[in-house]
Amino acid sequence: MYQRQVSFDKPTRVEDSAYIVEGVDIKEARNTCLLFSPKDSSLSSGALANILAIFKKHDINLVHIESRSSLRVPGYEFFVEADGKSGALGKAIEDVKEQCSYFNIISRDYKDNATAVPWFPRRIRDLDRFANQILSYGSELDADHPGFTDPEYRKRRKYFADIAYNYKHGEPLPHVDYTKEEIETWGIIFRNLTKLYKTHACREYNHVFPLLVDNCGFREDNIPQLEDVSNFLRDCTGFTLRPVAGLLSSRDFLAGLAFRVFHSTQYIRHPSKPMYTPEPDVCHELMGHVPLFADPAFAQFSQEIGLASLGAPDDYIEKLSTIFWFTVEYGVCRQEGELKAYGAGLLSSYGELEYCLTDKPQLKDFEPEVTGVTKYPITQFQPLYYVADSFETAKEKTIKFANSIPRPFGVRYNAYTQSVEVLDSKPQISNLMDNINSEFQILQNAVAKLRV
């Protein structure tokens, strides 16, 4: 079901699209993770020792061993990370399965294993594991990039890349002292875009943007700091920002959204072309994406796309990436009988923000099944936009589409532990139902008080 036909050593863009396949060149990416519960899963039974002996027998190097209380069966479960290139892992897996009541394989490099689930982060700190696997690094610019022949700009890009590369979850977001030239570039973009927002941006965007001006220093002569913006978003919807040096693979980027984490660049486009950038920069992130991550309905919609991606086969990752492109990046919606822009690619581009509401592009209703297989250009204005009636209806349609993804489990984000729960057993479902019942009782109590 999950078998990949082709693997790439590094994140690789597929054809002329925004879809980027993750790479497996680093040692950690080639490891195989095993999650299992021995038939006798009490810690005192010696069951784990027996299973570890199996790995030793087949010369498997284990790089991580973790025990935890199981939500699937009474007792404990174990999470083991094995070096996929050592020993006879296939034979070891067959022997371990015989000793277990529950067994699951999770692998980053799964092209030769049709039974493996593509690896995905379970805890928010797991985002550290792929945050630096990007399409290009720092000063590595394409020959047609405006800053390709500018040594100072390339040096500056490396500075930003190093900041992101060294960041770990839980640390304060790095403060950046932007240069006068960088602030002037930001100012040109800010000044032009804000002229169009009242007439072209959606209602939710125009509600949040003044709050960013008041609370986060959004103004023409100042580039906001990610830490200030992230704290603001956390208070609004629980979304946070995380610095990244460049484009992540589609699978890794979407996985961040499942935790309400948005990977954001801090560098800015080259000053020679302030109204153009061939890649996401801090202007695109802050002017385009950030305002709507402060809206509860849009935040939930974005997280649903992320949750749908966890453990999904490659072809569905491409579909979800395309849905993201036509919504979060280039989405248009209907409000009070008029078309308004809500996609970040539109809200951070003066030219395309003007263009998208004219009669030049084609418009179609947003339907994930159709949207997810639509081809699109990445170096010119979009000839087609998908129109959503509301973020709420877009979310419901996306959830329905996610139910068609062939994976043998459901997922749920636990905001208390900032972790993803894999729902694949009756005890887990029962526990979830108890939680829902408790929330429903709170709702009933609140409604009763409103009636008094």
UniProtKB/Swiss-Prot annotation:
Keywords: Allosteric enzyme, Iron, Metal-binding, Monooxygenase, Oxidoreductase, Phenylalanine catabolism, Phosphoprotein, Serotonin biosynthesis. Pathway: Amino-acid degradation; L-phenylalanine degradation; acetoacetate and fumarate from L-phenylalanine: step 1/6. Its EC number is 1.14.16.1, 1.14.16.4. GO terms for molecular function: iron ion binding; phenylalanine 4-monooxygenase activity; tryptophan 5-monooxygenase activity. CDD domains: ACT_AAAH (cd04904), eu_PheOH (cd03347). Residues 36-107 form the ACT domain. Its cofactor is Fe(2+). The modification Phosphoserine is found at residue 272. GO terms for biological process: dopamine biosynthetic process; eye pigment biosynthetic process; germ-band extension; L-phenylalanine catabolic process; long-term memory; serotonin biosynthetic process from tryptophan; tyrosine biosynthetic process. Phenylalanine hydrolase activity is found in yolk granules of embryos, and female abdomen and fat body tissues. Tryptophan hydroxylase is expressed in serotonergic neurons. Both enzymes are present in cuticular tissues. It is an enzyme of class 1 (oxidoreductase). It comes from the Eukaryota. N-terminal region of PAH is thought to contain allosteric binding sites for phenylalanine and to constitute an 'inhibitory' domain that regulates the activity of a catalytic domain in the C-terminal portion of the molecule. Gene3D superfamilies: Aromatic amino acid hydroxylase. It catalyses: (6R)-L-erythro-5,6,7,8-tetrahydrobiopterin + L-phenylalanine + O2 = (4aS,6R)-4a-hydroxy-L-erythro-5,6,7,8-tetrahydrobiopterin + L-tyrosine; (6R)-L-erythro-5,6,7,8-tetrahydrobiopterin + L-tryptophan + O2 = 5-hydroxy-L-tryptophan + (4aS,6R)-4a-hydroxy-L-erythro-5,6,7,8-tetrahydrobiopterin. Fe cation binds at residues 284, 289, 329. Belongs to the biopterin-dependent aromatic amino acid hydroxylase family. In Drosophila, the 2 enzymes, PAH and TRH are found to be encoded by the same gene. Preference for the substrate is probably due to post-translational modifications such as phosphorylation, or by changes in the N-terminal regulatory domain. This is Protein henna.
